[in-house]
Amino acid sequence: MAKKVANVVKLQIPAGKATPAPPVGPALGQAGINIMGFTKDFNARTADQAGMIIPVVITVYEDRSFDFITKTPPAAVLLKKAAGVESGSGEPNTKKVATVTKDQVKQIAETKMQDLNAADVEAAMRMIEGTARSMGFTVEG
């Protein structure tokens, strides 16, 4: 028989840097998860993605066991890394802060494809381009 789900926790944690300190510890403690067990597993699974923010969905069962799924980094984080900037524009329609090429957008779209609800890479590229424009980036190509 399948385990009963008690709670689902969604967090965004830097890869390889989950610690019991806030904000991770309190969120997991409230859900009744073994914090050290989760942080050890998460850090081991994301060690190769250092420097990225990794969204994670933690499913907690009634017997206090848990499973977690790591997703691809947010499109905004990937775009900022590709453009080499710290943050997007505060006024995206008037101030453009960076430029990304179609090739960079395609590469990000292919990376994000498993988490997007796009039928093909072209649709995923349009989604990523929209995110780029809303951050004040110019898409060339």
Swiss-Prot record:
CDD domains: Ribosomal_L11. GO terms for molecular function: large ribosomal subunit rRNA binding; structural constituent of ribosome. One of its GO terms (cellular component) is cytosolic large ribosomal subunit. Keywords: Methylation, Ribonucleoprotein, Ribosomal protein, RNA-binding, rRNA-binding. Gene3D superfamilies: Ribosomal protein L11, C-terminal domain, Ribosomal protein L11/L12, N-terminal domain. GO terms for biological process: translation. SMART domains: RL11 (SM00649). Belongs to the universal ribosomal protein uL11 family. Part of the ribosomal stalk of the 50S ribosomal subunit. Interacts with L10 and the large rRNA to form the base of the stalk. L10 forms an elongated spine to which L12 dimers bind in a sequential fashion forming a multimeric L10(L12)X complex. PANTHER family: 60S RIBOSOMAL PROTEIN L12, LARGE RIBOSOMAL SUBUNIT PROTEIN UL11M. Forms part of the ribosomal stalk which helps the ribosome interact with GTP-bound translation factors. This is Large ribosomal subunit protein uL11. It comes from Lactiplantibacillus plantarum (strain ATCC BAA-793 / NCIMB 8826 / WCFS1).
